[in-house]
């Protein structure tokens, strides 16, 4: 008996379904969560210099105030720590309680904490930063839950022909979130600058920071709640995925009923077949059986996500420092605080528009043609090449007149991150693990990525400091410099290329059950327990 005959009719119907309105609804509902995620995670990098000027400026100093090293590290990294925790917790919970049951929790947490972040008030600068960090941790916790849940829901709703494009489209909303963060910050800083003009710091230190600037960062952070609020109702209206209802909750009747409404077709209820194909699927995440079947793949998805995020987040969170080091953004003392915010956001918006967003959508359009494996290899190779192109002649790029080419090449590192491993590391873990462990394994892979992001955020902050003590920012020790930091990031990308080559399977055009080995379980069950080999080459016993 063939695999398709052994598969539940409801799952066959999903795999073979033509692209319909419910696919686009799912993309928008899940994608707006990622829009919010990216906006909230990356907009903080646009306002950290403003926070330093508002709360840590000494008018007697020749340079504007900046966040002390420990506070800068906390403000930039605390949301990532929360995200890591949320990915593990909600990934596990999504397999225990169901995808839909916990999907609303993450969005509510994001809404509440986005608003609360902007309401961080206290009597001292340190207390304001502590309150901000507290709410940004829990904001990150909610954001973390969106990773495994959105990826798993989209993979389980999609047909196998265009599944990669659908999951990639959800993730691509992250690019629009990054772009929106830049545009909102541009608009806010320009508007406040026009309403409350101020001189450059070197002209009048005290007057260069207007009191109204304190509203700017608060409004920017709170606006992150808006897209989440707009999609909450539709997120709650989505039915549970048929794969969870059938293969994990083992309720064939409910799965058939839900998907009959979604697909608008009659679907047979197959209680006996469900009992047959789910029999014996009780091995756990930490069992020898899981390690034999999926251990190498979990190592591959976790390791490659870790490596790409070391580079991607350090680049994203510290673009402002790189642009300052090559003199594309003027020295802080030559600007007022709102002009500095405007210039930083303009630079990051340009990078997002020209490199980040196009990369995501190249992945959407090509992933089901080229495949995940090749795109991930291409992306790691491109990031390695362009980072070496920036690092080797780095001193040349700091010379007047060369900054435009530097920014152009720098934009290509973002293009190949997003037309590459930043997107595919999100997609693959949602396709290759069993339904009852899919959300958990995606959460583990994503949390590994955030561990890399934390290393990138905290490590780059210190490592990129100049080697010359005379040019080190106040409160920091000499580091290895931006040039050597770029060499380190290029090395991470090269290792990611090798790990992809050895450990990451191709899932293009295959059903989730084929990739996870569940189809082979069904076939083995029908054949009286015979051994089979799954489509990715792992022996099934």
Swiss-Prot record:
One of its GO terms (molecular function) is symporter activity. Residues 1-26, 92-100, 146-163, 235-297, 371-374, 425-443, 506-541 are cytoplasmic. One of its GO terms (cellular component) is membrane. Residues 515-524 have a biased composition (Acidic residues). Keywords: Membrane, Phosphate transport, Symport, Transmembrane, Transmembrane helix, Transport. Residues 48-70, 122-124, 185-213, 319-349, 396-403, 465-484 are extracellular. It is a multi-pass membrane protein. It is found in: Membrane. Pfam families: Sugar_tr. High-affinity transporter for external inorganic phosphate. Belongs to the major facilitator superfamily. Phosphate:H(+) symporter (TC 2.A.1.9) family. This is Probable inorganic phosphate transporter 1-12. It comes from Oryza sativa subsp. japonica.
């Amino acid at each position: 008996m063939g695999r398709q005959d052994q598969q539940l009719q409801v799952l066959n119907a999903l795999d073979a379904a033509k692209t319909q309105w419910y696919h686009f609804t799912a993309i928008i509902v899940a994608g707006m969560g990622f829009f919010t995620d990216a906006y909230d995670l990356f907009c903080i990098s646009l306002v950290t210099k403003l926070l330093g000027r508002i709360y840590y400026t000494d008018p007697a100093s020749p340079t504007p105030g900046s966040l002390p090293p420990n506070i800068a590290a906390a403000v930039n990294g605390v949301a990532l720590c929360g995200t890591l925790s949320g990915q593990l917790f909600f990934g596990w919970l999504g397999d225990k309680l169901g995808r839909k049951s916990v999907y609303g929790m993450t969005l509510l947490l994001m809404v509440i904490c986005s608003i609360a972040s902007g309401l961080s008030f206290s009597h001292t600068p340190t207390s304001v930063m502590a309150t901000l960090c507290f709410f940004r941790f829990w904001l990150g916790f909610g954001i973390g839950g969106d990773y495994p849940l959105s990826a798993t829901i989209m993979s389980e709703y999609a047909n196998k022909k265009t599944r990669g494009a659908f999951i990639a489209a959800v993730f691509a909303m992250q690019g629009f979130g990054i772009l929106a963060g830049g545009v909102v910050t541009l608009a806010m800083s320009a508007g406040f600058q026009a309403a409350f003009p101020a001189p450059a710091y070197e002209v009048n230190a005290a007057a260069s920071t207007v009191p109204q600037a304190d509203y700017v960062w608060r409004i920017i952070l709170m606006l992150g709640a808006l897209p989440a609020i707009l999609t909450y109702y539709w997120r709650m209206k989505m039915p549970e995925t048929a794969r969870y209802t059938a293969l994990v909750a083992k309720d064939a009747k409910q799965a058939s009923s839900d998907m009959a409404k979604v697909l608008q077709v009659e679907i047979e209820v197959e209680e006996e077949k469900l009992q047959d194909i789910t029999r014996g699927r009780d091995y756990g995440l930490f069992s020898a059986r899981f390690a034999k079947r999926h251990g190498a793949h979990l190592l591959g998805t976790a390791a490659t996500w870790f490596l790409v995020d070391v580079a991607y987040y350090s680049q994203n969170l510290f673009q402002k420092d790189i642009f300052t080091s090559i003199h594309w953004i003027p020295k802080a003392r030559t600007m007022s605080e709102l002009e500095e915010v405007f210039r930083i956001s303009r630079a990051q918006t340009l990078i997002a528009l020209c490199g980040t967003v196009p990369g995501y959508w190249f992945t959407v359009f090509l992933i089901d043609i080229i495949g995940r494996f090749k795109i991930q290899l291409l992306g790691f190779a491109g990031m390695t090449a362009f980072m070496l192109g920036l690092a080797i002649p780095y001193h040349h790029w700091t010379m007047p007149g060369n900054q435009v080419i530097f920014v152009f090449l720098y934009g290509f590192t973002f293009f190949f991150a997003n037309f590459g491993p930043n997107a595919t590391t999100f997609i693959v873990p949602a396709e290759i693990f069993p339904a009852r462990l899919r959300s958990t394994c995606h959460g583990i892979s994503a949390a590994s990525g955030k561990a890399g992001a934390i290393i990138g955020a905290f490590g780059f902050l210190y490592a990129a400091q100049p080697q010359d003590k005379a040019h080190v920012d106040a409160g920091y020790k000499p580091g290895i410099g931006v040039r050597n930091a770029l060499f380190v990031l290029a090395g991470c990308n090269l290792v990611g290329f090798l790990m992809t080559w050895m450990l990451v399977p191709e899932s293009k055009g295959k059903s989730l059950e084929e990739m996870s080995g569940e189809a082979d379980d069904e076939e083995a069950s029908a054949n009286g327990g015979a051994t089979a080999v799954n489509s990715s080459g792992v022996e099934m016993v």
